[in-house]
Amino acid sequence: MDLIVNGEPKQVSNEQLHLVLNELGYAGKHFVVELNGEILSKETYTTTKITAADRLEIVSFVGGG
């Protein structure tokens, strides 16, 4: 399935958001997900389905000093 992730086209094989995030390498990381302009709570990741042409923005947190 084709998605737009952080402004770039990506091909993924899953339709469940939590599986898509794992497929994209976000497992175990701290991040926030915006789906089609709406910020999602982490509790909804396992119940949210992705459809073709959805737009995901994934923002990771980076520590620094």
Where are these regions (language model features)?
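Ubiquitin-like/PB1-type beta-grasp interaction modules and other compact soluble beta-rich domains
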Residues: 1-64
